[in-house]
Structure formats: structure tokens, C-alpha cells
Amino acid sequence: MASEARPGVFVPRPHQLEACEAILAARRADRPGFLLGDLTGLGKTLSAWLAVSAMSEDDILIICPKGAIPQWRRTIAGSPQTKKHVTIVNFERTKSLLALNGTSARRSTRAKNNELARTGVPKRRWPIVVIDEAHRIRNPASQQGLVCRQLAAAADFTIYMSATAGQSPHELSYLSRLMTGAPAGPKAEMDAFRTLMKEMRIGRAKGRWKNWGWEPNEADRSAMAERLYKGTAAIGLRRRPEEIAGWPQVQRALAPIALDASGVRLYEATWREFRRELGLLGGSTRRPVGWAADLRFRQKASLIRCEGTADFVCDLLDNGQQVAISVAFLETSARLADILSGRGWRVGAINGESSGEVNEATRVAFQRGELDVVIFTVTESISLHRGEMAGGDRERSLVVHDMRHSAIQLQQIEGRCHRDGQRAVIYFAFAEGTVEERVAQIVITRMSAMDGLAGDDTALLDDIVRTFEEAN
């Protein structure tokens, strides 16, 4: 977001005005849309709204995660008034914007929803559509992907916003109209995108989309970056925080968590059970495929580390900081909250168990300095940075208690506190002397080099799988 000149009024920064002008230039050139790919924390919401406000169309549709709705409302309220008629809807409710031609003969709710997503038509048309966190529609066969693409196809201009557009080139098919000039419509767009992938000789674009394949390589990444952001016919704009004058670079650090004797024994037993479930003991050499086993191992390991993470967080709090803790599991969130509140700290939680209103109230309390710690499970669309609100001027740190096996998710998490020109050191916690130490080293190395372009996410997961296979 931008700085506040007075309560409720935002003053855009130069880089946000630059993004606004780039979007408007695409509109003037009669392009079908624009990809705003700035990294998290650079204020994409205000940049997009500035552009939308300057357009002549009055009816605007904004599609975003549920957690981002308060941010959009606040941005619109804190900007100069317009006569725009704005509809804001979260991804899960986009199906309500379509209607079937006739009555469905399907029996189950899921089947009816699938039919609606595939064959439904928009109840009305919005000339300007904004899709925030657009990577959510990268699967063209998903219900949200089908619905959002129809709404975008019916629009005159669509702004796609995402710091992490896709894991691999073929997941960028939702940008087909921008990249190929294809006629609007799911089939025409997919056909044109398939042809483009073949012309660029990127991966295997044959048959059904889910069967498309790609081996990560630098040549393809560079070619796709040129198409997206760098060439004369680039369809979007992407900047990193360090490229903005005066903005701090992301600082990452490893935070080893020491386990006590009982914790070590419990962790080792959990690790042995995990490998046994995957068939990695007793001479078996098959590749790990047990998603459920992996989830159980990570959940148990997460709980085992809670005491150590709480000790580390308390050190940061004792130094006068506020701390945001990213976790993957509700049980871990509850355990950390119990430990830290039991030590006298003011703790709040943001997760799926609470309503959007309750989560926003918790976020605001943290931003005003009324909470010392906030523990969150979401990976996107919330602002937890220093200086957003009065009373929230303490230095911030972000502790990633649960390492995600996705560079895209981790980059989204990093932008919760390190944003809007405010620095927050990001600590990646791991159990010292365990396989987590090697995984953490892989992740932090990859994140340091990641440009957010296609391929990094899948390559990171492959590296982690190899680490699990090779660990003793």
C-alpha cells in the first residue's frame, strides 16, 4: 500500500504511478488486459485501483481471495471518490455470477457446480475485471478457472495480479489472450496457447492439459520472462522490492531450533515411521508417493518444535519487536498461542476457524501494536508490516515455523511483513541436526535466487524429495 498523508487517504508512490500508467497504456493500445506481477509488498492493490479509477467504464468486477476483501475496501475508501459501481467477490463465490441455460439434471451439488462452471453464462457483463492473486485460476479445468476465464472473456479489459503467476509455463494459459491475441473464449484461448508452447518448443503441450509436461530449464524461463515482462511486446510489469529506490532487500536467515532429549527421541521415532510408511527402509528404493504420510510427518514434527520456536520468538519479543509466525497446521497455531500467552505475551491468531471479520479485527489489533504476536495459517492477502497504522511502529520479524515445500507459497508468506518499504527479517525455523536442516538450506538458497518465474516451484519440490530419499 502507499503511505498515508492523513487517516484514510493514500498517496501513491512513484512506482505505483508507473504501474498505473503501464496498465493504462495497455488499455489505450486496445489490449485485452495486463499482468501486474510486482513482488509481494509493492502495493499492487493501489496500483490497479489507480488505473481502474482513471478508466471511463463505470462497472467494475474485482475477484480476489476472501482475506483480501478488507484490503480492497480500504484501498477504495482511502482513494479519491469515483462514480464507479464496484462488485467485489471472492473466488469461492464466483459461480454465483453464472447461470445455466435451462435446468440442470445433475443430482449432486458437485456435479451441478461442475456443469455450471463448464456451460454457464455470465448473468451480467462487467467491462473491467480485476483478478487478484490470478495464479489461483492457472488450472483451466478447475471450477474457479473456468468461471473466471468466462468473466474475463466477456470483459473489455482484465487486470491480472500475481507475484507468482505459475509454477510452470503451461500454467500461464489464463494469460493466453494477452500472449497470443486469441479470440475470447476458453477453447480458442487454450488452442492458441497450445500452439504458442509448441512454437516456443517449451515442454510437451499434447493431449489434455493435465498431461502437459515440462522439465525446468533456464532457456525456457528466460524465453517466458521475455514474453511476460521484458520484451517490446511484454504483457505485464514486474519489479522486486530492491529495485524500488530506498526499499530494503529481503533478508532471510536460518533459525535452528534445539530439541531437548525427549524431543529428539520423539522426532527420530516420527522420522523412522515416516520412512517406513514410504517404503524407504528394508532395501526398498521406490520413490516417495505417500502424500498422507508426508503430511503426518510434517504435522508431528511441527508440534515437536513448538517449545523451541516459542523460545526463539520470546528472544525477539524481549528485544522490543513484534513477531508474526507462519504455521501450516491449526494444532500448531493453538499450541504456540498457549505457550506464548502463558509466558505473558498478547497473542492473536488468523486462520480458517475464524470469520473474516474476526480475522481482520485480529490483524488490525496487531497492526496497532495491541498484540505482540500474531500466528497465521494463510499464505496471501494480509498485511502485517510495520507502520501501517498508528501504534504499529515496533520493528517486525516473521518466523516461518512450518517450511512449505513450495517456493510460490513461501514467496507469498514472505510478503506479509516485508512490504510497503518496511523491512522485516524472515527467519526459517528448523529442528537442528535433522533432515529439516538440509531442507531449510535448500529452500533459502532457492528463494534467494528465485525470480518468481515458472519452474522454480517444481524444481524446489524435486530437491526436497531427493533430500528425504538420501537422508539416513
Spans of features found by a protein language model:
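Conserved pre-motif I regulatory segment
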Residues: 1-35
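Walker A/P-loop
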Residues: 30-51
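Conserved Walker A/P-loop ATP-binding site and its immediately adjacent core
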Residues: 45-77, 166-171, 328-331
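Conserved P-loop NTPase motor "coupling/switch" region that bridges the ATPase
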Residues: 128, 145-244, 422-423
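Conserved helicase/translocase motor-coupling segment
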Residues: 242-346
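Conserved helicase ATPase core of P-loop NTP-dependent helicases/translocases
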Residues: 322-326, 335, 341-378
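Conserved RecA-like helicase motor core of SF1/SF2 enzymes
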Residues: 379-412, 416, 420
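A conserved SF2-helicase RecA2
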Residues: 405-472
